[in-house]
């Protein structure tokens, strides 16, 4: 018999934002997934390779050339989270490309989602669907592909023995690493349809949501796992649906900003968006997170987050069951 979970929400107004936050008693859906990889399409691969390795300080876990012409490098942000840098070929437009969500059982995820109503992808159904499981090459991971209603690609991925990601996880020795891939942002074209997809079909818990001061836009944080989230916003009038930015958690934001400036990143004002810069630190409202933005050579935004005691993300983590 399917268990019904009742949700109780508290509404709080913070700096003009209406924040709706689940009560501490809300139970976790625990869909068996966690954010593990976000893909980056680079305009200048060599420049981006230097940026992520020497400036950001991320370890190159492994590299490969899928077609003998373009290149991919996996950078290890933490023991089990990665950024996948890809050399743009046919489409030179830089940006974030796709999401991997780690699972211990891809077959079970596919079966659960199909039972929930996510249809198999086909020649005539290319969004709001999921593919059959496969062994991805050359990484040797077991994975499937979900395409959400906006065309965003999500790959449930199993780090099976012998896969390149499993080898990278097992060989991780950086005990002092203080960074982790925590949030990926998406912009969707049909907000209610996407809400239905992520809440009812994917089974993600609403960690918290808030509306813009004018009430015209809603941002929803879905909790994928205890410490990883999907941040969903409606696409801007002049924009296209897709991935918007990532959040990287750090234990000491000021120290990380100082290290990045020492590594050569120019300082930027809080609202600056210039490539190869890091902005001043501030507290983002209404999530109450200490943050700064890094813009890579392609203009891709990496939001550095230090979780304060009253941060909404920290509260969501602490209430995860």
Predicted feature locations:
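Bacterial N-terminal signal peptides
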Residues: 8-19
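Vicinal oxygen chelate
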Residues: 3, 23-31, 33-44, 73-75, 89-177, ...
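Core segments of cupin and vicinal oxygen chelate
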Residues: 30-33, 39-82, 108, 115, ...
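Short loop/beta submotifs within extracellular cysteine-rich repeat domains
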Residues: 59-60, 81-84, 92-93, 108-109, ...
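Generic signature of mature, soluble extracytoplasmic domains
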Residues: 47, 102-105, 158-160, 165, ...
